[in-house]
């Protein structure tokens, strides 16, 4: 019988009753796979379970949930000493699963679990905001952030990622830009931004490719700004034919700094962070993550 590395699955409490997942884990255990399961109910649970994972000596901690769960587990993992840090696997169980989708993680529970347990680990970058808060996928600001944070849970549960678009169309009254200044290496822009995306990964908000050229192991952040010129016409052109829109500005840098004369909120993989000054930089190759061999986010 083949031997498999030991793993610990940290499961978001919203998915604790998933019968298909329960059956898949039972089948793995019947085939000799050692997989521990822990369920999160409140903030801080993931960090405690990773402490336990290190004590158990598991090779992989699997993030079972959406982008927020992946973010919480990745953040807790990079706080561990590199010598004892397990690799991270991904089991996409959230509403949008933006990072998992863009990374090519299988939608099938069985295939995703297999990849998370025995897939080859690649060293990936982690982004950090103001030397404190981290994200693995993307930081978004502006109209999209307000929509994502306010989309009702029942709508997300019923419709998944498309719920963000539907709720956005319902809340066009919120469509107002943020005035800010953005600096990076060989990059400077100042003006009114409708949407800002700073990507380590490529997509956010339920499938919107905000930073289509981003890679998670190239040491660079990708920036995309949707300016507010013409507002509604600009938004329509941007959504229907983004590569030809004059209202899009792109940039790349190892770091970006955003300064606003008023409070802004950025969504970091689902976690809101408010302020008037944000400095976003990269921690290169900070985490080993089990990804498909043909993962489009790897160079």
Swiss-Prot record:
Binding site for Mg(2+): 215, 218, 220
Pfam families registered for this protein in UniProt: DAGK_cat (PF00781), YegS_C (PF19279)
Localization (cell): Cytoplasm
Stored SMART domains: DAGKc (SM00046)
Active-site residues annotated for this sequence: 271
Cofactor binding notes: Binds 1 Mg(2+) ion per subunit. Ca(2+) may be able to substitute.
Broad enzyme group: transferase
Superkingdom as given in the UniProt entry: Bacteria
GO CC annotations on file: cytoplasm; plasma membrane
Cysteine disulfide partners in this protein: none
Functional note: Probably phosphorylates lipids; the in vivo substrate is unknown.
Family: Belongs to the diacylglycerol/lipid kinase family. YegS lipid kinase subfamily.
Protein name per its UniProtKB record: Probable lipid kinase YegS-like
Organism: Enterobacter sp. (strain 638)
Lineage, highest ranks first: Bacteria, Pseudomonadati, Pseudomonadota, Gammaproteobacteria, Enterobacterales
């Amino acid at each position: 019988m083949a031997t498999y590395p030991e793993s610990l699955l940290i499961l978001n409490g919203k998915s604790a009753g998933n019968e298909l997942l329960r059956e898949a884990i039972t089948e793995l255990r019947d085939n000799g796979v050692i997989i521990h399961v822990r369920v999160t109910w409140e903030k801080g649970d993931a960090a405690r379970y990773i402490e336990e994972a290190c004590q158990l000596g598991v090779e992989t901690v699997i993030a079972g949930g959406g982008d927020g769960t992946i973010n919480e587990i990745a953040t807790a993992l990079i706080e561990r000493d590199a010598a004892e840090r397990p690799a991270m696997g991904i089991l996409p169980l959230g509403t949008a699963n933006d990072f998992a989708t863009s990374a090519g993680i299988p939608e099938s529970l069985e295939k995703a679990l297999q990849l998370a347990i025995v897939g080859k680990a690649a060293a990936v970058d982690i982004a950090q905001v103001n030397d404190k808060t981290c994200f693995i996928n993307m930081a978004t600001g502006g109209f999209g952030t307000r929509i994502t944070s306010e989309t009702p849970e029942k709508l997300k549960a019923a419709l998944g990622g498309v719920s963000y678009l539907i709720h956005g169309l319902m809340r066009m009254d919120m469509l107002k830009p943020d005035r800010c200044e953005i600096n990076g290496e060989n990059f400077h822009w100042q003006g009114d931004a409708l949407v800002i995306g700073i990507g380590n990964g490529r997509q956010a908000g339920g499938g919107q490719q905000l930073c289509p050229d981003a890679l998670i192991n190239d040491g660079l952040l990708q920036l995309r700004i949707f300016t507010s010129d013409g507002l509604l016409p600009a938004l329509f052109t941007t959504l229907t034919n983004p590569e030809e829109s004059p209202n899009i500005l792109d940039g790349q840098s190892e770091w970006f700094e955003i300064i606003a004369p008023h409070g802004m909120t950025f969504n970091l993989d689902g976690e809101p962070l408010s302020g008037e000054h944000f400095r976003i930089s990269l921690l290169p190759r900070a985490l080993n993550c089990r990804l498909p061999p043909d993962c489009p986010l790897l160079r």
